[in-house]
A protein has these predicted regions:
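Short beta-strand-loop/turn "lid" adjacent to the catalytic site in phosphate-handling enzymes
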Residues: 50-86
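Short glycine-rich, Thr/Ser-proximal phosphate-binding strand/loop in the N-terminal lobe
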Residues: 2-45
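Residue-level preference for the first positions of well-ordered beta-strands
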Residues: 1-2, 59
Length: 86
């Protein structure tokens, strides 16, 4: 599965895809002061509610207009999904 982050100034839209099919999506607040662990905590809850596990994620892509969030989401991807994001 693919986890896509579309980061805007106000919100991060996260989508989970299996092939071309969008399985789930969520909207989180964009916060450059949030840590990778903080985002992982929120995503972990959303994953569990929807019957997903971090180990289901095989690829991560980050699209952003907020450059300071890139290292945070890169760290999240590496630490929790064991994936180097695109």
């Amino acid at each position: 599965m693919l986890l896509a982050f579309d980061v805007g100034n106000t919100n991060i839209v996260c989508g989970i895809y299996r092939g071309k099919e969008l399985l789930n999506h969520w909207r989180l607040a964009t916060d450059t002061l949030q840590t990778a662990d903080g985002y992982a905590s929120v995503l972990g809850t959303l994953f569990r509610i929807n019957g997903l596990q971090f180990s289901d994620i095989e690829d991560v892509i980050i699209s952003t207009v907020v450059p300071p969030i890139i290292p945070i989401l890169e760290s999240l991807s590496r630490r929790y999904f064991s994936v180097n994001p695109i």
